[in-house]
Amino acid sequence: PFNPETVYALLAMLISFFVLLASARKENSDEGISFNFTNFTRGDQGVTLLGQANIMANGILALTNHTNPTWNTGRALYSKPVPIWDSATGNVASFVTSFSFVVQEIKGAIPADGIVFFLAPEARIPDNSAGGQLGIVNANKAYNPFVGVEFDTYSNNWDPKSAHIGIDASSLISLRTVKWNKVSGSLVKVSIIYDSLSKTLSVVVTHENGQISTIAQVVDLKAVLGEKVRVGFTAATTTGRELYDIHAWSFTSTLVTATSSTSKNMNIASYA
């Protein structure tokens, strides 16, 4: 059925993206990062794997162990730090990332806990971050700097009462959420745009059945993160468990600096 709110949200995201692209073309940038993994290869130096994360023979990046996914925490990151803002100018990067993933439930197990695309100061998995902490938050620390988009499959006491997509900043109590009608085993395609001019993080999620979910939130990256961040995915389980597999991932950022001499354009990848 026609949903005017969804159409409006998509148009707003497209307008935001083209404004972002026009701005990037007008100015010089030499601090952009761009990569595109249409699949993954074992031993690829472009990806750092931590915890139970592994690359399977079929080119899929598994964040949990397919043989024994109980009490798993897996993290996969782009291997190099990504400049996200510049102290000399105060400028903040804009970026776009697209990825596709599958969540596979396990017969007889409670489906939990979820997967997060994130930007964070460090590569390592935080201590005390199993299960509902999604491998991103140390439950014993009052402050955990990160920005992320979570795909949460289990309702903890701080969560909405169903599976959901959320935008997070330094807390798993999401700034904004939308219900996620997850279908086990189906491919989910995600595009995320951060527009530094409006400080808006926008997300479009397309499901295999054609359903589209959108969510957006103002997030000040400079207020949360240092000048360089690590970018990637994290997933965690306990006795409640699922399989979390990344099929493809692209990322492009543009950061204007005082000494820039070249320009990098941004693009949204699509996956068949």
UniProtKB/Swiss-Prot annotation:
The keyword Thylakoid does not apply. Keywords: Calcium, Glycoprotein, Lectin, Manganese, Metal-binding, Signal. GO terms for molecular function: carbohydrate binding; metal ion binding. Mn(2+) binds at E150, D152, D159, H164. Glycans are attached at N36, N39, N65. The keyword Metal-binding applies. CDD domains: lectin_legume_LecRK_Arcelin_ConA (cd06899). This is Putative bark agglutinin LECRPA3.
